């Protein structure tokens, strides 16, 4: 079927002229038309096939051709124009969508039109009644829509699902819809919202969550286009929020022009994990169904982008933040995917329709149904509902509404004038179960029915004709009356009461799913009793899915089928595929799995692993291979949404894959190299054509799991298009990597590179060195090798101390939400000089200001210099040093509107103490350096490396990136924080005293380290060291300073390339 549009406008045409080459094109302005048209292909562009229905006052019109006018030819944006001779006087018809994108304004006073910030003179055309040749595409006056005695041709279309009505019903319904035309939403209209209810996100803590996915460069223009549309609609705004949820770009079906469409999805799973559940009661389905019995008319109503018509609470707006490559945004309307969104929608509709509930209509989550016994009563009820929705400023999606139905499906039941009937789809999978013809099929069927044998009296006797066919050398005769009778009776028994029960919404639901090589199966149950069985076959693309993809597809399909039972309730999913039990903990799922995880985020469930032998019901349903005539609509729907012909993007560097294909511009050539155990193919090309791309895919990808790298997005689109043809051959997954690192070929080169960087950055630790190396270079087993190299660094062994934690229990404290909210200060002394040290807690940006003495006046002057450089914080935290506890300093800070918070006695300020320890280490390292210039400016060197060149473990960014350049920290999730805390507390119990520290009673101090570190270390000869600590000299043998070797270290002989 093609697309269906309407075209309406004012009775008198008006047009503008736009210059194209040497011609002045007459462009008709039609604010009522949802399509653009051109009388002829004056642009010499390729003609596209389409099937578009235009409804005019002269009747329906089908247009089969269109052209796509690229950007900058006529307008800054790309637009589709239907190719049809709609008029002899005009060249183009500009519809509502194009006018909206162009931010068009029409000034009748000045007689001009503004499009894309360009002004055009508005010219009055020929009146409608005088123009015989004009085909009335745009000649349906707006006034006609308001006349109750005339029917708009828009409403006569089957687009609005009115084909089942007789003439009287259609006439009266159309009159009602014309009366309430203001609540109808059409594509391109600005979406309104209600202020009846606001959605609030209450979280367990106020720690900002930050996570981000990268999306392909090829999607960037589409993403920004949709972002701009939502900004224009007022759905989102730009944001400064510390929160960030990742976005995912999901491909949709192509439009009639063949252009690929996409949908932006926000992954709110992390936010949902810390969101407090909304306990708003969900209506009892039995009570709702009880009120719908024996009605003659039913209407189901769908709100246009329902969630986006509800306003967000201002206090919760910041928590909905997300980011693209070009900006940070937050929702002003309720987005899809939030945990409590269904409950808020239910509350909102209850408040709006409360006077009408149970009498004229019912609401269940996002389903609204109007019911009555007669046509007059039903139209009256619809009018009352429309009136309430209009007052609440809500809009309807008419093409998704069903009006005046005498039989409809609602909440899994079929509503008819004769009463409520169970949905036949609940047992369709059982009724269509084919008669077993092989022993394996008999076992599967008896496993399905035998699962409920405790509810079937004399099960063994009934099943005997089938069980005896399992004996050795026993022939299976499906025409045997006893065999056929046993099969049919068992199917009947498990499809009827007392086995198949009516759902009890006070009890927990269990959804059991399974997938085989050919089909999917699922059963919804409570307390062991089945409520509904479903199964379907896999389409030609789904058969190629991996096992975990098929298993997850079964869950996605089943939750969609049983959505009216499961949405808004906690339930359990049982699966015999164990990897699904840690679905949300996968670190690198592919695009399909990630997209399906996002789809499941609106449900509240736990995944439970069960053994395969316990999953006999869903397993049997998943092994039914139905004939083509039995394929359900859901199967076809899955086929429509399938995108297995797409090459997905991965964040993994190309170098990590065993089979790598690199496309580069240059004289045509192909080079194949080996890098350790990895196979690398480098393809040089001058122009990427469809034919070349197909040959490359067949020669280098088919039958081989590979990853490719290509810089040009335009050339990648050619490969993507050719991939659809190559997919029919023996196929395995292809990924596109956007990261290509430089390969290091030998261990000697690798070690030299690590040592150089390690020394240049003042000897950072293992993790920081590994991250720094991994941003640019690749070498197999680099992490273990870097650990080995750094552990053998003599300067690190001498200058650094172990970072042990105090033995007090660690607890999370409220984190600041932005820079300059909270500073920590302390006095730092080194080599006879004193400094006021300061660190911004949010960004970890640090600075030092030298002072002559440690009194409050010097500290005040130092703080003034710090405030001039960094700005004033809201809160200043310090220990109880005499200068900081001074009443005079406190009063000065109060006058500056800065709150001073002092720690309790004998406790340090953790972040600032850790900074001091880092500075001490770096200074000791600098002292061992031969660079005299560095020694003279050591404090400046340390601060420069700390602030600008070292990524902090907590934020994942350099302090300067966040503090000076408004970058966003990459914060850990609450679960990761709790895991780290538990590990720290466990390590305190199990650690051993390092021999680098003096043996004796443990001495606790302000530092995180509970031991007193050495103050001054000197090497007396090749085997001995002298330690001076508080004027006490102790001699040690050199082995006491060496780090213990880790069990998992690689020796040089094990390293690649040696």
From Swiss-Prot:
GO molecular function: aspartic-type endopeptidase activity; endonuclease activity; nucleic acid binding; RNA-directed DNA polymerase activity
Keywords of the record: Aspartyl protease, Endonuclease, Hydrolase, Nuclease, Nucleotidyltransferase, Protease, RNA-directed DNA polymerase, Transferase, Transposable element
Database matches in InterPro entries: DNA/RNA_pol_sf, Integrase_cat-core, Integrase_H2C2, Peptidase_aspartic_dom_sf, Retrovirus_Pol_polyprotein, Rev_trsase/Diguanyl_cyclase, RNaseH-like_sf, RNaseH_sf
Domain Integrase catalytic as annotated: residue spans: 810-967
Keyword set includes Transferase: yes
EC numbers for this chain: 3.4.23.-, 2.7.7.49
Catalytic activity reported: DNA(n) + a 2'-deoxyribonucleoside 5'-triphosphate = DNA(n+1) + diphosphate
GO biological process: DNA integration; proteolysis
Domain Reverse transcriptase as annotated: residue spans: 231-415
Active site residues per record: 30
Miscellaneous section: The open reading frame is located in a copia-like transposable element called 17.6.
Family annotation (PANTHER family): PROTEIN CBG26694, PROTEIN NYNRIN-LIKE
Protein name as annotated: Retrovirus-related Pol polyprotein from transposon 17.6
Species for this entry: Drosophila melanogaster
């Amino acid at each position: 079927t093609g697309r269906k549009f309407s075209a309406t406008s004012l009775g008198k045409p008006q047009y503008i002229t736009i210059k194209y080459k040497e011609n002045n094109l007459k462009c008709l302005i039609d604010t009522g038309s949802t399509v653009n048209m051109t009388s002829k292909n004056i642009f010499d562009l390729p003609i596209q096939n389409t099937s578009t229905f235009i409804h005019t006052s002269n009747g329906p019109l089908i247009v089969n051709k269109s052209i796509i006018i690229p950007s900058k030819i006529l307008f800054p944006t790309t637009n589709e124009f239907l190719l049809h001779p709609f008029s002899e006087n005009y060249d183009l018809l500009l519809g509502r969508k194009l006018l909206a994108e162009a931010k068009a304004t029409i000034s009748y006073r000045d007689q001009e039109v503004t499009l894309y910030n360009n002004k055009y003179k508005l010219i009055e055309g020929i009146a409608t009644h005088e123009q015989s040749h004009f085909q009335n595409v745009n000649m349906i006056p707006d006034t006609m829509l308001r006349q109750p005695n005339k029917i708009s041709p828009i409403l006569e279309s089957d687009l609005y699902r009115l084909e089942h009505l007789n003439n009287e019903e259609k006439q009266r319904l159309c009159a009602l819809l014309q009366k309430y035309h203001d609540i109808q939403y059409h594509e391109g209209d600005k979406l309104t919202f209600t202020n009846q209810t606001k959605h609030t996100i209450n979280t367990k803590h106020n720690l900002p969550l930050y996570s981000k996915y990268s999306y392909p460069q090829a999607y960037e223009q589409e993403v920004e286009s949709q972002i701009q549309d939502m900004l224009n609609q007022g759905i989102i705004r730009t944001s400064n929020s510390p929160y960030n949820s990742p976005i995912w770009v999901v491909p949709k079906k192509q439009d009639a022009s063949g252009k690929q469409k996409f949908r932006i999805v926000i992954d709110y799973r992390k936010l949902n994990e810390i969101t407090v559940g909304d306990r708003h009661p969900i209506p009892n389905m039995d009570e709702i169904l009880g009120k719908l019995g024996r009605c003659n008319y039913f209407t189901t109503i769908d709100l246009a982008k329902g969630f986006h018509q509800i306003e967000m609470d201002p206090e919760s707006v910041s928590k909905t933040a997300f980011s693209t490559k070009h900006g940070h945004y937050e929702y002003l309307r309720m987005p899809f995917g939030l945990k409590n969104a269904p409950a808020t929608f239910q509350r909102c509709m209850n408040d709006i329709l409360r006077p009408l509930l149970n009498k004229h209509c019912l609401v269940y989550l996002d389903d609204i149904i109007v019911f009555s016994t007669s046509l007059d009563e039903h139209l009256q009820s619809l009018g009352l509902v429309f009136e309430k929705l209009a007052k609440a400023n809500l809009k309807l999606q008419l093409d998704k509404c069903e009006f005046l139905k005498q039989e409809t499906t609602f909440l899994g039941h079929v509503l008819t004038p004769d009463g409520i009937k169970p949905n036949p789809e609940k047992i369709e999978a059982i009724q269509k179960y084919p008669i077993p013809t092989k022993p394996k099929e008999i076992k599967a069927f008896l496993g399905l029915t035998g699962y409920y044998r405790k509810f079937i009296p004399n099960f063994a006797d009934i099943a005997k004709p089938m069980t005896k066919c399992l004996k050795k050398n026993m022939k299976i005769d499906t025409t045997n009356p006893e065999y056929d009778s046993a099969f049919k009776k068992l199917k009947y028994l498990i499809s009827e009461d007392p086995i198949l029960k009516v759902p009890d919404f006070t009890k927990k639901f269990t959804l059991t799913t399974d997938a085989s090589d050919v089909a999917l199966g699922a059963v919804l149950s409570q307390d062991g009793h089945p409520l509904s069985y479903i199964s379907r076959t896999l389409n030609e693309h789904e058969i190629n899915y991996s096992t975990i993809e098929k298993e997850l597809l079964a869950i996605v399909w089943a939750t969609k089928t049983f959505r009216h039972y499961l949405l808004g309730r906690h339930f359990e999913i049982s699966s015999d595929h164990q990897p699904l039990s840690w679905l949300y903990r996968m670190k690198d799922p592919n695009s399909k799995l990630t997209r399906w995880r996002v789809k499941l985020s609106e449900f509240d469930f736990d995944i439970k692993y069960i053994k395969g032998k316990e999953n006999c019901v869903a397993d049997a349903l998943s092994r039914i291979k139905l004939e083509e005539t039995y394929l359900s609509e859901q199967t076809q729907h899955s086929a429509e949404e399938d995108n297995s012909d797409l090459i997905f993007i991965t964040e993994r560097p190309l170098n990590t894959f065993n089979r790598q294909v690199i496309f580069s511009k240059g004289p045509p050539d192909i080079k194949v190299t080996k890098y350790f155990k990895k196979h690398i193919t480098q393809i040089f090309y001058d122009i990427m054509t469809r034919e070349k791309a197909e040959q490359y895919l067949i020669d280098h990808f088919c039958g081989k799991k590979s990853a490719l790298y290509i810089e040009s997005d335009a050339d990648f689109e050619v490969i993507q298009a050719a991939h659809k043809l190559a997919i029919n051959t023996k196929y395995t997954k292809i990924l596109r990597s956007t990261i290509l690192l430089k390969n290091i070929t030998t261990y000697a080169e690798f070690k030299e590179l690590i040592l150089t960087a390690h020394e240049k950055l003042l000897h950072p630790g293992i993790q920081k060195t590994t991250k720094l190396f991994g941003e640019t270079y690749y070498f197999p087993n680099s992490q273990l090798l870097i650990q080995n190299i750094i552990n053998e660094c003599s300067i690190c062994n001498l200058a650094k101390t172990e970072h042990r934690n105090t033995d007090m229990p660690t607890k999370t404290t409220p984190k600041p939400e932005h820079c300059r909210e909270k500073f920590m200060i302390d006095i730092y002394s080194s080599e006879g000089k004193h400094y006021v040290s300061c660190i911004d807690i949010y960004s970890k940006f640090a600075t030092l200001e030298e002072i002559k003495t440690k009194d409050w006046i010097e500290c005040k002057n130092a703080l003034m210099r710090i405030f001039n450089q960094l700005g004033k914080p809201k809160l200043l935290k310090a220990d109880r040093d005499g200068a900081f506890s001074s009443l005079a300093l406190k009063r000065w800070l109060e006058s500056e509107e800065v709150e001073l918070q002092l720690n309790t006695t004998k406790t340090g300020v953790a972040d600032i103490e850790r900074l001091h320890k880092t500075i001490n280490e770096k200074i000791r390292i600098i002292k061992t350096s031969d660079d005299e210039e560095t020694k003279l400016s050591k404090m400046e060197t340390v601060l420069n490396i700390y602030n600008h060149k070292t990524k902090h473990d907590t934020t994942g960014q350099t302090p300067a990136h966040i503090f000076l350049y408004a970058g966003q920290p990459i914060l850990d999730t609450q679960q990761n924080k709790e895991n780290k805390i538990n590990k720290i507390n466990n390590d305190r119990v199990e650690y051993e005293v390092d021999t680098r520290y003096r043996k004796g009673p443990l001495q606790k101090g302000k530092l995180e380290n509970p031991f007193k570190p050495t103050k001054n270390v000197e090497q007396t000869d090749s085997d001995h060291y002298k330690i001076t600590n508080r004027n006490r000299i102790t001699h040690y043998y050199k082995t006491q300073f060496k780090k213990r070797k880790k069990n998992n270290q690689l020796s040089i002989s094990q390293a690649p390339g040696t």
